[in-house]
Each structure stands twice: as C-alpha cells, then as structure tokens.
Amino acid sequence: MKKEQKKLTEMTTAGGUAAKIGPEVLASVLSQLPKNDNIENLLVGLDTADDAAVYKLNDDMALIQTLDFFTPMVDDPYVFGQIAASNSLSDVYAMGGKPLVAMNIVCFPSCHDMDVLAEILKGGFDKVKESGALLVGGHTVDDKEPKYGLSVSGIVSPNKVLSNATAKPGDKLIITKPIGVGVLNTAMKEGMVEQHIADKVIEIMIHLNKYAAMSFEKFDVNSVTDITGFGLLGHTLEMAKASEVSIEIESKHVPIIEGAIEMAQMGIIPAGMYKNMHYVSKDVEVVGNIEVAVQDILYDPQTSGGLLISVKEELAEELVKDMKLNGAIEAKIIGSVVPKGEKYITVL
C-alpha cells in the first residue's frame, strides 16, 4: 500500500516552539507540583524556570539534563531534524556546559512515508555530531502529528554552572541571534515569504549556540538563558524574576529578521505570541512611541533562538566581538540590568 505523501507542515496545527503550551497555563500546572526536598547536589531544579536541570556528581563534575521536541515548521525533513536538534542542544550551552550524549524523541504516523522519518533523523544526527556529542538511541510513538527532538545529557564544572538567576544590576544584556522566527515561520507556511528570507530564517534556526558559548571559556558572564517559545520578553522576564532585578530593553537595538516587521504589520502573527503577551505584558512598561509591530515581535515565540546573556558592562563589547569571531555573527548588546523596580521589564 502506498504511504501518505503530505507535507510535514500540513500535518500540524502549530510548528516549532510556537506549539508549546502557553506560559500562563504552564505556570498554573507547575505550581501544583510538590517541591523537591532540599537536595544539596541539585544545583538547578524547577524553582527558577531555567533551561535545564543540573545535578552535582562530585567536586569536579555536574550533570546537565534537558529535553526538547516539537512539531515541524518546515517541509524539508532533513532541515526539520537539524532545527529540532539545534534547539534541543541549546539548553546545555545556556547552562555553560558541553553536550555528551543525546537520544531521539520521535512521534510519527506509521501511515506516512518512513523515508521522511529517516531524513529527519539524519538531520538530527548531523547536528549532534557537529556539537561533539553522540546520538545513542531514542524512543518512538505512532502519532498522527509528527514531532521530533532530543533528550540531551551534558557536563559542566559545578563552579561554572550558568543560570538565568544570576543577572546583576549594572550588567549589559546581549542577544546572539535576531528574532522574528515565529512570525516568519507562520508566513512561510502560507507561502508569503521571499526565498532569500526563508533561507535566512532556516540558517538562523539550524545554527548551533555552541559557537556563541565558546566565548564563555574566556569571559566570565553572570547569567544566561536561551530564547525559545516564550519569546524575548518572556525569557527576559524569567531572568529578571529569578535574579530579582529589572531589565531595560532598547528596542531599536534588538536585531529583527528582514521581513518580520512587514508580516507583523499585516497581522501574520502566531497564536503563541498572543499567549506570551497575555502572560508577560503585565510586567512590562513600554516607554516612548514604539511601533506596534516591533512590540509584537518582542513577544514572538522563537524556534532554536539565540542566547540571552547578562555580563558586566566593561566586558560586553569585547564579548560581542569574540562571539562574532567564533561564528555568532549577529550578537548584539540590547539592554541593561538595573535594580528591581516597579516593573520587571522596561522597553525603551
């Protein structure tokens, strides 16, 4: 019997990190979980909504554990595999670590062409290999909607763990990739994006945060998270709350992918953006006349987005230069950390 040949994006209701449960609903669910007892070796757990868990094994080594998976946002199965793997590996880099082993998480309809699944797995394998980790197995579920990602284990020195809870007043805030992926993925699904812009979006999503994180070996950064489904302002809010600070974002310095503003002006906006805005906006003050489309994109759910880094002001410019030399060519200073004020975030 001939297998189905539907496009990947035709088999999903939402793609990439835009398919995540919204932050407000998720926070409500997680608030019902019991707290872990005071476990001395659990360095990072549930409390600060961080990117991964970190468990101290001994004085020299801690284990980083994370997983991530989502539905397709592109039709090319190999590229989808690359994007999903890059996104999954990112959490390890955000914690200051090195990925060691990864395992596939696969949901795929058995009625569909299995060569498509093979291409997805090849894309994931190649990105894991690029990261320096090993792909060692996985688990599958027969599901009408395809989903793919990785469970990743990494290591880090216990005294070099990076967190979203350690931003300091006086720090500068750096982003390592431009935003607007969610808006443009939505437009791409409708065939509304020029090919050179679509190629740029894919290039951004498959780029490993490994290259930006290489600079952490030379520069002492204070706090890091990665920007994914909750958007720039959503993950900035997590950092501000966890660190008990406020953060100022200079909107004119935030890098936005070509075409994203135009699509947002036309109302091409993923549902995840509205979920993010509903949850986060009460903690945000907007100062000045900032275009509505730009404000919207600050809430845009990113798929395999960049790192958000808080670092001492005197190190910020040199850190950006170093990251660019390592391949994070669009790294940019976008704001500052200030003492806790009335609002957690001010957009200027």
Swiss-Prot record:
InterPro entries: PurM-like_C_dom, PurM-like_C_sf, PurM-like_N, PurM-like_N_sf, SelD_I, SPS/SelD. Its EC number is 2.7.9.3. It comes from the Bacteria. GO terms for biological process: selenocysteine biosynthetic process. Binds 1 Mg(2+) ion per monomer. It is an enzyme of class 2 (transferase). Keywords: ATP-binding, Kinase, Magnesium, Metal-binding, Nucleotide-binding, Selenium, Selenocysteine, Transferase. Gene3D superfamilies: PurM-like C-terminal domain, PurM-like, N-terminal domain. It catalyses: hydrogenselenide + ATP + H2O = selenophosphate + AMP + phosphate + 2 H(+). One of its GO terms (cellular component) is cytoplasm. It holds the Pfam family AIRS. GO terms for molecular function: ATP binding; magnesium ion binding; selenide, water dikinase activity. The record marks 20 as: Important for catalytic activity. Mg(2+) binds at residues 51, 91, 226. Homodimer. Belongs to the selenophosphate synthase 1 family. Class I subfamily. Synthesizes selenophosphate from selenide and ATP. This is Selenide, water dikinase. It comes from Clostridioides difficile (strain 630) (Peptoclostridium difficile). The lineage of its organism: Bacteria, Bacillati, Bacillota, Clostridia, Peptostreptococcales. The gene is selD.
